Amino acid sequence: MLASGLLLVALLACLTVMVLMSVWQQRKSRGKLPPGPTPLPFIGNYLQLNTEHICDSIMKFSECYGPVFTIHLGPRRVVVLCGHDAVREALVDQAEEFSGRGEQATFDWVFKGYGVAFSNGERAKQLLRFAIATLRDFGVGKRGIEERIQEESGFLIEAIRSTHGANIDPTFFLSRTVSNVISSIVFGDRFDYEDKEFLSLLSMMLGIFQFTSTSTGQLYEMFSSVMKHLPGPQQQAFKLLQGLEDFIAKKVEHNQRTLDPNSPQDFIDSFLIHMQEEEKNPNTEFYLKNLMMSTLNLFIAGTETVSTTLRYGFLLLMKHPEVEAKVHEEIDRVIGKNRQPKFEDRTKMPYMEAVIHEIQRFGDVIPMSLARRVKKDTKFRDFFLPKGTEVFPMLGSVLRDPSFFSNPQDFNPQHFLDDKGQFKKSDAFVPFSIGKRNCFGEGLARMELFLFFTTVMQNFRLKSSQSPKDIDVSPKHVVFATIPRNYTMSFLPR
């Protein structure tokens, strides 16, 4: 009995010492790192966070500590940037220092620092330069990709017409369409909409994004070193990631067998050719692992973000039928009903442009951006960030900055219209991030959003099974990604 009592006292004493040391270390660095709540050993600020609403939970600290503060997500120390000014100062004014890539534990399980999106240093530089050039070679930013999107829009319209106005879940109708655009670039061809393997891949991607946006997904972000060895939903997420990697490996093997060095058919071919050209370069980053991970980067990013934005957009238009009516009026006046929309039409369609921008602003699909990391010891404002410090630029806080958007919690296309009804840009429109590690697929995504939205709205009216006042447009999850609520709808021919 005495021994157990002494053991308990010893444990309490050790815990007290650890807490006091944590407080001392925090105060010692206060003159350097931004301020923030005092962390506990290992668990950090976990007890002060609501993992169901992690973004809002993190943002609340700004009320006490200001727009730049430090939190501890378990053992991870992260500097958080809130609001337009802080985010722009870091990502644009000090772009080079803040251009490192931070941790994204779920995706890091498969990427492990390889591939264009999650790499750092010379690897990131080489792969990014190649990816941008290769996408351009396959038509991105040119008329070629616009024709590809228009063709895919036609397939989408046919698929929707085949529902004959029935109540449907639009999720996979939209993700099939969007994914086929990037698939035509990275794999050289589109998938049939009924292809079972294709539908399985889309389901895997959706499942991964949904996991990262759950409470368990956020726990994994904090305690991945422990949780990756334990049973739980994270193991299912790993299986989904492995399934996607296996699919990419199969595609790469096929291209290796059929490769014509003089006639690349897709992104994989182009990378394989570059691997051959660089095989004697000891510093090359062009090898099989980076090929597979870069291809997987493009496939996932080119599918989920745009399709989620479309899904959120149709829900918002059903919630606001007066906006849908104005969209229809502008389409009929500028394009009519007898020709396909073109990307250049957007210059004559300020209201449609404003609606799409407001959908992106309100939807806020990647609210915390991908984590950044400072590449060297960095002075930021009055603070000192040691080399390697992780940084969360809270894009959602910029998209809802009241200095730029009146009533930022409301969906209102007027946020992007001037007094004359003309489209107006905003420095706080940052859904693709800004600076050196912004989304290099931004141009493709903008074109897809305009052409897909406009083509669907040209052909259909949207009908919900609920009255507009009963439609809930609050997100299902807001963590790594913003996931809209599940819903069904009807597309009625116009």
Swiss-Prot record:
Known EC number: 1.14.14.1
Residues the entry annotates as binding heme: 439
Induction remark: P450 can be induced to high levels in liver and other tissues by various foreign compounds, including drugs, pesticides, and carcinogens.
Q: Could you say which cofactors this protein requires?
A: heme
Chief subcellular location equals endoplasmic reticulum
Q: Choose one Gene Ontology CC annotation of this protein and give it.
A: endoplasmic reticulum membrane
- What keywords appear on the UniProt entry? Endoplasmic reticulum, Heme, Iron, Membrane, Metal-binding, Microsome, Monooxygenase, Oxidoreductase
Q: What class of enzyme is it?
A: oxidoreductase
This enzyme catalyses: an organic molecule + reduced [NADPH--hemoprotein reductase] + O2 = an alcohol + oxidized [NADPH--hemoprotein reductase] + H2O + H(+)
Recorded GO terms, molecular function?
arachidonate epoxygenase activity; heme binding; iron ion binding; oxidoreductase activity, acting on paired donors, with incorporation or reduction of molecular oxygen, reduced flavin or flavoprotein as one donor, and incorporation of one atom of oxygen; oxygen binding
Question: In its keyword annotation, does this UniProt entry include Metal-binding?
Answer: yes
Where does the UniProt annotation locate this protein?
Endoplasmic reticulum membrane; Microsome membrane
Q: Which GO terms describe its biological process?
A: coumarin metabolic process; epoxygenase P450 pathway; xenobiotic metabolic process
One matching Pfam family is p450
Q: How does it sit in the membrane?
A: Peripheral membrane protein
Write out the similarity annotation: Belongs to the cytochrome P450 family.
What is the protein's known function?
A: Cytochromes P450 are a group of heme-thiolate monooxygenases. In liver microsomes, this enzyme is involved in an NADPH-dependent electron transport pathway. It oxidizes a variety of structurally unrelated compounds, including steroids, fatty acids, and xenobiotics.
**The protein, known as:** Cytochrome P450 2A7
Organism of derivation: Homo sapiens (Human)
